[in-house]
């Protein structure tokens, strides 16, 4: 039996010493004390002076600079605690440190609540007088955004209550869901009895070439998730209701409106993405009709979605994954290699599998003066190579955006998926160019098509599930798990049409999706980013070297401009349904290419 890479090589774990030497580092408490002192000082110095008719550009610029210095210090302890906690959510000491930093953040933030509120209340004539001054030019985007948010702000006393209670409301329930899922063990039936597996270990078996292995893995997932049904359904209902209350208090019309405002996108643009994607679900059905034929099956069910169409998937050691990714990046620009090599050399990546480690993958960019960290669960599959590229893409974006000040450092969510998805495309293109036989090219292409479906159509199906779940909670009251199962299953099944039947065992699989708990309505950002990158990548293939600098400029902008403004510079109109349809057409072309290769 062939061993997986994680059994034959040591996978990297983080070195977080660039943040703190350890959980007992005196610098942690020292930084929290200093940030708290600076917050109190900031409040004394600036409160009541921002929303004033006589406000000068110089005074506002000084306040913004002090605010950034304070936040740069404040964010560091929480970032360290969050990174540490995600590698072992079962460790009480790590959980306690995470909670300590969150409570510190809340107590510090109570002294800062006034600032954004006062920016929103600067008299219009005063803002008109100072907004175009050279001193404020670097902060103009941030100021304009905060003033747009002002319509949804509460009074300072009310905002303080929400800040103070955040850790005992939704944030606490979201942490509970994370811990429940991280602690869950899945019991897979094998010869000799059941074998216990973590979430990351069981999910990878859905890609196994043996259908019975996939079936048993799926059954184990369903059984494990159903054990959590009561707790996770209660948690989700609580979060749905909390959002309903907050939306009512803040005068948001629809559940998703606050996310659109944060993302600096209009509801009309997001609706266009969602509706165009849903109108192209037929592409998914067409592909799975093809896949059923390739697999030689009479019908497909949910555990056949990711079945490889040829033989065993090769286990790829992490060192080889590194070479594949860096080699692909280097063909685009040596600059990408220069940015990414330190992630490997200085242990900015945590890839090992471990009990208690949360599932999934992410990249954490904290502040412009700190390097990002990449988190993943590396099992050695080809898709894990793509995940490594994806998260390093985020890291590239963070590094290139570090020339911005903190308040414009992070790109909004839809733009944050640009570099990550583009990085995947670079790896895919290189791998495709190295293959010689039609069979190999077909297998790679089918894997990419399925990944694209998961990023575009599945995320839109999830977004629609979220929309319906939030509305159902507001109209029907607390939702039983069966109702949530029904909404999940309906939206997921629509994507496949009559080409694949998900089956009742799949109905509870919403229970392990972290984004719907942690960041409501995040998921449409994936579809936005993937379809955007399909267009950008087509332009790169057409323009070659001329495109590279324009691409770097796009990433270097960070969050300094809204998506529509950033992309207008590349002659892209995000309000155009034709643009999004163009991306869906490119996906359909891949399906047609797969059909041609299959004969």
Where are these regions (language model features)?
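C-terminal, non-catalytic "cap/extension" segments appended to globular domains
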Residues: 7-10, 17, 21-23, 115, ...
